[in-house]
Amino acid sequence: MSTYTRPVMLLLCGLLLLTLAIAVLNTLVPLWLAQANLPTWQVGMVSSSYFTGNLVGTLFTGYLIKRIGFNRSYYLASLIFAAGCVGLGVMVGFWSWMSWRFIAGIGCAMIWVVVESALMCSGTSHNRGRLLAAYMMVYYMGTFLGQLLVSKVSGELLHVLPWVTGMILAGILPLLFTRIVNQQTQARHSSSISAMLKLRQARLGVNGCIISGIVLGSLYGLMPLYLKHQGMANASIGFWMAVLVSAGILGQWPMGRLADKFGRLLVLRVQVFVVILGSIAMLTQAAMAPALFILGAAGFTLYPVAMAWACEKVEHHQLVAMNQALLLSYTVGSLLGPSFAAMLMQNYSDNLLFIMIASVSFIYLLMLLRNAGQTPNPVAHI
């Protein structure tokens, strides 16, 4: 049976369009607020409302999938995201936009839970790494192309909202031509997020998603600031960020394939070790290009491998709940990491960004090394 079936390919096509819209809005919303002369703290609050929406959306999507299935949950998530986009054109204001970005955040989180859960339920322990790698490749490619779109088209609010909304609605179309079966509805017992978080045999996967959130959130949010403080121009900052993201895209498929072939525990150990090496290399500033490349290739691929590790430890009907737990863990890490790193950078030194990344990665590496010989056979193999 092919790894990339017709439903999987159509699902990824829809995700690409939705990710383009997400990237465009995430880039332009802060700029629109600044043009409206809102103070910086209000711009930050609007951004926080989006991430709060992500948390809320993550919590209830599993129940929704169980009730109405993958397809309808996907349609509903896309429509909620589209509503959050259209609402931005009603009125530019702090409370209005905070509400609409909260709604958009819910829709986006629902999309991620639906897509990730559908891919995991479609795969097996032998190909789930490649499926999640393809998901991350599409996600990062959509993010990259979204940045290109922002630089090529008019950034005016009322010019952008119509075609972005159209792109969101177009993202629904691929799934109208296929049906993703939700085998979880056949299970007698449903699983909760809290139960998945407490599952001992999957704890390394959960911790890996938290670490991944800390690493990626810090790199995405604070690397441009670090480079700016090194005296680089905006064009140079854009180039080095492109190197970082491109490395993440290029690393997805090989890492997924290696994880499926040689085991996720071994690949996770190598990835975390490489993240530590890349962080140390960034501190020396001896060779920024290779240092950033290996940091991106290893750091950006942690999440799908950690997910695949956790998902092979649960029964098939528990996959949706496990995915919610993993996405929630990643979100928490991506909120905590940049906040703590920014505080260290402001009060002490910019180099503490990479010291923090290396430190949390080292702690996770110790957890992975302690797990030697404790690798029970996967149960989610059907």
Curated annotation (Swiss-Prot):
Annotated PROSITE patterns: MFS
Compartments, as annotated in UniProt: Cell inner membrane
Predominant localisation class: membrane
Segments traversing the membrane: 8-28, 45-65, 75-95, 102-122, 131-151, 157-177, 204-224, 231-251, 270-290, 291-311, 325-345, 349-369
Molecular function via GO: transmembrane transporter activity
Residue intervals on the Cytoplasmic side: 1-7, 66-74, 123-130, 178-203, 252-269, 312-324, 370-382
Family statement drawn from the similarity comment of this UniProt entry: Belongs to the major facilitator superfamily. YcaD (TC 2.A.1.26) family.
NCBIfam families documented for this protein: PRK03633.1
Record-given protein name: Uncharacterized MFS-type transporter YcaD
